[in-house]
Curated annotation (Swiss-Prot):
Subunit structure and binding partners: The proenzyme is a hexamer of identical pi chains; each pi chain monomer is cleaved to form a small (or beta) chain and a large (or alpha) chain by non-hydrolytic self-catalysis.
Cofactors that this protein relies on: pyruvate
Record-linked Gene3D superfamilies: Pyruvoyl-Dependent Histidine Decarboxylas, subunit A (4.10.510.10), Pyruvoyl-Dependent Histidine Decarboxylase, subunit B (3.50.20.10)
Molecular function in Gene Ontology: histidine decarboxylase activity
Keyword field contains Metal-binding: no
Keyword Lyase: yes
Gene Ontology biological process terms, A to Z: L-histidine metabolic process
Residue numbers of Pyruvic acid (Ser) PTMs: 98
Marked site (Cleavage (non-hydrolytic)) residue numbers: 97-98
Note on how the cofactor is bound: Binds 1 pyruvoyl group covalently per subunit.
Source superkingdom: Bacteria
Propeptide cleavage-removed residue intervals: 2-11
Organism of this sequence: Clostridium perfringens (strain 13 / Type A)
Name of this protein: Histidine decarboxylase proenzyme
């Protein structure tokens, strides 16, 4: 692209007195609006407006009491993980591995930025050195997970869910295990708990490189103490982010930051548990787009979006 032309298209927008923000001209159309008023849809489905997509983060768990059909038990526990927290129930989940590319944007970071991110209130959990010596700052993914709940809603308070029966490409993995009812040594495939991770690493050159999703999931077999499992997962974060650095090395991609989060559950005796990590690639419901248009989502915070939608916050009921 002609650099002078691009410079002319770059703009500074006024957000109030002594409050200006710079908006860089996009090189790629990232508009992502579904054909439905109240439903999001899967990326690549017919009828969408724009060439872009939106990545939404979710980690959840679900459990069910074991019956005499372990296959059906696995289906139900997976379904419960889908509907818990941010609601992604009733979808045909297709698997991608696993990037948010140059046409994609992240809900809660790029679009309707979570207030804690917009105000630069979050602090790194730790740092790792990347292949070129650049530090990779690792942040808690809680703001992005909360943003997903605010967009999709919950099972009891649904908002802009994906269309029932929609075909939705997702970065996803899951783990399923049975905790025996009897107090006996565990057999292969049995566990006391299950867990899942999601990590999203943002490239430092997002016009030319993709953001990386890493999903991980597994079984907890040591004991039935949830605090021990939580401690293991807190330590395991560094293994997950090690894989981020190594994938960056493979493609010579340097990341600006990583968001990482996990979910876990200790099953009751006689239960089957599922831990799901997923990031749906969606186009936004028409009514989820402010009246100022899709680009306005790049300029507003999550709380401003909630105000525009006239929603109360689901994760912080005292705030909109």
């Amino acid at each position: 692209m002609n650099k002078n032309l691009e410079a002319n298209r770059n703009r500074t927008l006024s957000e109030g007195i002594h409050k200006n923000i710079k908006v860089r001209a996009p090189k790629i159309d990232k508009t992502a609006i579904s054909p439905y008023d109240r439903y999001c849809d899967g990326y690549g489905m017919p009828g969408a407006y724009g060439n872009g997509y939106v990545s939404v983060l979710k980690v959840s768990v679900g459990t069910v009491k074991k019956t005499d059909d372990i296959l059906l038990d696995g289906i139900v526990s997976y379904d419960r993980a889908e509907i818990n927290d941010a609601y992604v129930g009733q979808i045909n989940m297709l698997t991608a591995s696993s990037f948010c590319g140059v046409a994609g944007q992240v809900w809660g970071h790029d679009l309707a930025t979570h207030d804690s991110i917009a105000k630069d209130e979050i602090k790194p959990l730790y740092e790792l050195k990347q292949f070129d010596g650049t530090p990779l700052k690792v942040y808690d993914a809680k703001p992005l997970l909360e943003a997903g709940i605010e967009l999709f809603g919950t099972e009891k308070n649904r908002r802009f869910t994906t269309a029932p029966g929609a075909h939705v490409i997702c970065a996803n993995k899951s783990a399923t295990a049975y905790r025996p009812k009897e107090n006996r040594p565990l057999k292969e495939g049995e566990a006391y708990g299950v867990w899942s991770f999601i990590a999203l690493s943002l490239s430092n050159d997002r016009d030319h490189c993709a953001d990386l999703f890493i999903e991980d999931a597994g079984l907890w077999t040591k004991n039935d103490n949830p605090e021990d499992l939580k401690k293991f997962l807190e330590d395991h974060r560094k293994a997950v982010t090690w894989s981020v650095v190594e994938c960056g090395r493979d493609s010579h991609v340097v990341f600006e930051r990583t968001y990482i989060g996990f979910a876990y559950v200790i099953m009751k005796p006689g239960e089957i548990g599922n831990a799901l990590t997923c990031a749906p690639y969606v186009t936004l419901a028409r009514d989820a787009v402010p009246s100022e248009g899709f680009p306005s989502l790049n300029r507003i915070s999550l709380s401003q979006w909630l105000d525009d939608m006239n929603f109360d916050s689901l994760v912080n009921p005292s705030k909109k």
